[in-house]
From Swiss-Prot:
Gene K overlaps genes B, A, and C. This is Protein K. It comes from Enterobacteria phage phiX174 (Isolate Sanger). Somehow affects phage production, although the protein does not seem to be essential. Belongs to the microvirus K protein family. Disulfide bonds: none annotated. InterPro entries: Phage_phiX174_GpK (IPR020962).
């Protein structure tokens, strides 16, 4: 994964954290599960252990 893509994914993950933390979307039943899924995917993708296992 290129450095630029990693940085974009990290910024996106920070944005998801901020949206969750702010509570602005807490009442939106459609967006909340999508953000949770996006957060999970980004964390898995950016996890060093996941990336190490893919490389080997």
């Amino acid at each position: 994964m290129s450095r630029k893509i990693i940085l974009i994914k990290q910024e996106l993950l920070l944005l998801v954290y901020e949206l969750n933390r702010s509570g602005l979307l807490a009442e939106n039943e459609k967006i909340r599960p999508i953000l949770a899924q996006l957060e999970k995917l980004l964390l898995c993708d950016l996890s060093p252990s996941t990336n190490d296992s893919v490389k080997n």
